[in-house]
Amino acid sequence: QVSVMPVREAVRRLAAEGALSISSSGRIVAPSLTNEKIEELASLRALLEPELASKALPRVHNALIDKLVLINSTIDQMIAKKDVIGYIKSNLDFHRTLYLRAQAPITLALVETVWLQFVPTIRALYEDTPRSQAPNYHRKILSTLRVGDEPGLRLAVRADVTNGLRMLL
């Protein structure tokens, strides 16, 4: 028999991180995002994620680039299958795989907290208006990684994260 305490603790943690809301009656819901909140989250991503990518760049190697190419192919497959959850998971996996190389766990934890807050809204948006093709930003990120172009990498990551969230406004 499994105790409900771990579930309760997980729900409390997600609520503390802004991914869930708990009403006074105990009802649990994914909070809807206002335009102001979306803009704030987009600003945070635009600040933090290019920094993580930049810190990761000196530790990028061919095997990592190959892994990112594979993840990007999975993103294309998820879009073709109209698998919204698979698309979101693969997209976040692409970013997380790169950012882990930054060896900046505190910054990565902040970024993941931001992701938690907007994923339910993105899921609803993509279910209403599914993508027909993958955005080109990941390809730009990959090309900058291949040549070690740090300013280009920062720009590509910033464009990727801000344009993705701009769809929500």
Could you describe each region identified by the protein language model?
Residues 1-58, 63, 165-169:
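Short linear motifs at protein or domain termini
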Residues 9, 49, 83, 91, ...:
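Acidic active-site catalytic centers that drive phospho-/nucleotidyl reactions
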Residues 15-21, 113-114, 130-132:
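Mobile beta-alpha loop/short-helix "lid" or hinge segments that flank ligand
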Residues 30-33, 56, 79, 122-126, ...:
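Short amphipathic alpha-helical segments at helix-loop
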Residues 37, 41, 62-123, 136-143, ...:
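Conserved amphipathic alpha-helical segments that form helical-bundle/coiled-coil interaction surfaces
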Residues 57-58, 103, 127-128:
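Short helix-capping/hinge motifs at transmembrane helix termini and TM-loop junctions
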